[in-house]
Amino acid sequence: MDKSKQPFRKSKRSFRRRLPPIGSGDQINYRNMSLISRFISEQGKILSRRVNRLTLKQQRLITIAIKQARILSLLPFLNNEKQFERAESIPRTTGPRTRNK
């Protein structure tokens, strides 16, 4: 059978595994802000393990370090800075609403 006649066969692509985000020399500590800040979203939330590509043990240690840094006020609990500009309000074309009795 020709290869052109096999439409559902997947082509083999080279797969390159990503490097882990935490190296073997990195210490997971509440004082290591450059490491901790990589695992926090823009809103100040702890990113999930799937997003971080961490092992279960690393994620637990990162979570504990982030919580300790928050308690010691090295990190904010929330990041409430406005990231967007509010668009101008569009005026209504209809009159004021009246209540039906």
Curated annotation (Swiss-Prot):
Which species expresses this protein natively?
Answer: Dioscorea elephantipes
* Subunit comment: Part of the 30S ribosomal subunit.
Organism classification: Eukaryota, Viridiplantae, Streptophyta, Embryophyta, Tracheophyta
Q: Which Gene Ontology CC terms are recorded?
A: chloroplast; mitochondrial small ribosomal subunit
One Gene Ontology term from the biological process aspect of the record: translation
Q: Which family does it belong to?
A: Belongs to the bacterial ribosomal protein bS18 family.
| Record's compositionally biased regions (Basic residues) | 1-19
Query: What gene is behind this protein?
Result: rps18
Enumerate the GO terms in the molecular function aspect.
small ribosomal subunit rRNA binding; structural constituent of ribosome
Ranges for the region named Disordered are: 1-26
Q: Where does it live in the cell? A: Plastid, Chloroplast
Determine if NAD is one of this entry's keywords: no
> What are the record keywords, sorted?
Chloroplast, Plastid, Ribonucleoprotein, Ribosomal protein, RNA-binding, rRNA-binding
Please state what the protein is called. Small ribosomal subunit protein bS18c
- Main localization is plastid
Gene3D superfamilies attached here? Ribosomal protein S18
